[in-house]
């Protein structure tokens, strides 16, 4: 059985800046398997977020191949990419990106409703998910009524509620104080293990990186395992 769920092969990404071309990624190869815990570290501006966006189908590479399951990102249209993302990937960012006018329950229901799940079934599933992240008493609270750590836990619940194959997280604890960041990260690892969902985290926090199974360094466009 092939447990590889997301791959990049010979991935290049460059941007044109006036008369010059900036090469951000230079032939990046990466294979992510079920249940993986991967940290991607590197200097600011090295292209870590760019790589995450490419893996998630949020941006297109200059050249190279990205596959999610057996699907080539570049061979499908935007509607199909959205459907595939919603089915198989979860995203967590430094800023929670919760919709301010909706409650925690409603925010986490969004990916399920977009996938066509009935409201009653989605609500039941979300209540269970929010209970797992310790927020059942906060179901009807809007983002402004939640602490920073609680908002990020809602974002994690939203990323995991549809049981994706892989979660891509970009500095998920970057806006939190040390104690809260540690609790949020503990929760992510717990759910990663419980759900066997691959977890790929871009981080500057060495303490977080040390707790992952693999630490990859992105430097001058190349991705390699840290020695």
UniProtKB/Swiss-Prot annotation:
Organism whose genome encodes this protein: Legionella pneumophila (strain Lens)
Catalytic activity, EC: 7.6.2.-
UniProt binding sites for ATP: 42-49
Domain annotation ABC transporter: ranges: 6-227
Gene Ontology CC terms: plasma membrane
Assembly and oligomerization: The complex is composed of two ATP-binding proteins (LolD) and two transmembrane proteins (LolC and LolE).
Protein known as: Lipoprotein-releasing system ATP-binding protein LolD
Protein's GO biological process: lipoprotein localization to outer membrane; protein localization to outer membrane
NCBIfam families, alphabetized: LolD_lipo_ex
Annotated localization: Cell inner membrane
A single GO molecular function term of this UniProt record: transmembrane transporter activity
Keywords, in A-Z order: ATP-binding, Cell inner membrane, Cell membrane, Membrane, Nucleotide-binding, Translocase, Transport
Membrane topology: Peripheral membrane protein
């Amino acid at each position: 059985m092939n447990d590889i769920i997301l791959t990049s092969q010979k991935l290049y990404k460059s941007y044109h800046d006036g008369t010059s071309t900036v090469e951000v990624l230079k032939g990046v190869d990466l294979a992510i398997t079920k249940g993986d815990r991967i940290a991607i570290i590197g200097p600011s501006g090295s292209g870590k977020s760019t790589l995450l966006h490419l893996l998630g189908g949020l941006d297109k590479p200059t050249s190279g191949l990205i596959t999610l399951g057996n699907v080539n990102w570049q061979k499908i249209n935007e509607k199909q990419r959205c459907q595939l993302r919603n089915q198989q990937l979860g995203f967590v960012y430094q800023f929670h990106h919760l919709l301010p006018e909706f409650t925690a329950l409603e925010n986490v229901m969004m990916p399920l409703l977009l996938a066509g799940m009935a409201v009653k079934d989605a609500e039941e599933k979300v209540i269970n998910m929010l209970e797992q992240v310790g927020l059942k008493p906060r179901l009807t609270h809007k983002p402004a009524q939640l602490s920073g750590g609680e908002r990020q836990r809602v974002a994690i619940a939203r990323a995991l509620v549809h049981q994706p194959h892989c979660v891509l997280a970009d500095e998920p604890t970057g806006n939190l104080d040390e104690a809260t960041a540690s609790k949020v990260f503990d929760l992510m690892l717990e759910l990663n293990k419980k759900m066997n969902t691959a977890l790929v985290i871009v981080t500057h926090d060495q303490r977080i990186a040390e707790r992952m199974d693999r630490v990859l360094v992105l430097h001058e466009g190349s991705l390699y395992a840290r020695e």
